UniProtKB/Swiss-Prot annotation:
Subcellular location: Cytoplasm
GO BP field: amino acid biosynthetic process; aromatic amino acid family biosynthetic process; chorismate biosynthetic process
Record-listed phosphoenolpyruvate binding positions: K21, G91, R119, Q166, R344, R386
Taxonomic lineage: Bacteria, Pseudomonadati, Campylobacterota, Epsilonproteobacteria, Campylobacterales
Designated name of the protein: 3-phosphoshikimate 1-carboxyvinyltransferase
Family of this protein: Belongs to the EPSP synthase family.
Organism this protein belongs to: Campylobacter jejuni subsp. jejuni serotype O:6 (strain 81116 / NCTC 11828)
Known pathway: Metabolic intermediate biosynthesis; chorismate biosynthesis; chorismate from D-erythrose 4-phosphate and phosphoenolpyruvate: step 6/7
Purpose of the protein: Catalyzes the transfer of the enolpyruvyl moiety of phosphoenolpyruvate (PEP) to the 5-hydroxyl of shikimate-3-phosphate (S3P) to produce enolpyruvyl shikimate-3-phosphate and inorganic phosphate.
Active site: D313 (proton acceptor)
Amino acid sequence: MKIYKLQTPVNAILENIAADKSISHRFAIFSLLTQEENKAQNYLLAQDTLNTLEIIKNLGAKIEQKDSCVKIIPPKEILSPNCILDCGNSGTAMRLMIGFLAGISGFFVLSGDKYLNNRPMRRISKPLTQIGARIYGRNEANLAPLCIEGQNLKAFNYKSEISSAQVKTAMILSAFRANNVCAFSEISLSRNHSENMLKAMKAPIRVSNDGLSLEISPLKKPLKAQNIIIPNDPSSAFYFALAAIILPKSQIILKNILLNPTRIEAYKILQKMGAKLEMTITQNDFETIGEIRVESSKLNGIEVKDNIAWLIDEAPALAIAFALAKGKSSLINAKELRVKESDRIAVMVENLKLCGVEARELDDGFEIEGGCELKSSKIKSYGDHRIAMSFAILGLLCGIEIDDSDCIKTSFPNFIEILSNLGARIDY
């Protein structure tokens, strides 16, 4: 894909940002904990979340879909499928399904694409194995494909050494099948969509005031079925917020955006850098929803070291903001970036250098000198949708060619369409 420099300002109201990926995955998987029809409007129709629907279909669920309205009727009993459960590129789908299936009677095989099958799964498989799960795979069940033989699970008191909503949710799902009350805690607060959704479904889960500790009881009855409207994804919206900031005389209003406090940290970073950015809450249901208004702004350098789990998906796009800011910026305490869809630390630094930016790898982040003269270049996405979309936005300033841009479809299928509608010239 080649993106040409955009010569005109942008002034737009965007209501068609991709639906939230985290909530879409959870809606589909959590429907298996109910016994009645579940309904979601504005379900994300991207490769990752469509794969999740296919997985639960192979486990016995019936699915009706009309455009982005999805109805799921769960099976009376989870089937042991005669096929591999394909998670595609989604670490969320694989890790949550490991936790869900560990306590289900049956034999299950989870696999993904070449990128997912090289991402670490021991953070899930190890604690589950310790409570009786049988999980087999390469490198001591660290790499998919993974085989899961469902077992009766023991109660646990698990203290996670990493802040990960995927680990947390996998352990919650396994706790529902354990033989007694379970406890989970993490070192810092990760995304809390699972807790919010499960509480709305009347799950037997208690959350401490600081959100760091959970008490989960085994399920004694099916959970309440869901009927929700999924808000738009703040991580996907972030690319267009960034576009409004870096393009002269531009303004973008982003509508129906999820404003969960654990998902807007990157926007707060932009505000601290000097961005003219306002967030307004319009609705409070099981999640906080609102709009984001962004205008062209001059940015200043910044050091980012806190709440990293809350901006891990936006880090590549933040690196673009760093490159366009005045002065030096850095992101640290972000070693998790090395085990995402790509090694995002190495890949961002490599590609920024190709575009004329002074950038340096740190063990747990990167350091970027802003204000360098940009040059048009060809960059590699390494199959990482967030790398591809971040450099697509930079391409609006300097022109850019992106290798393997099809990965964008895993999370944001209409990204190119929106970019084109804003006036960008794209050879795709």
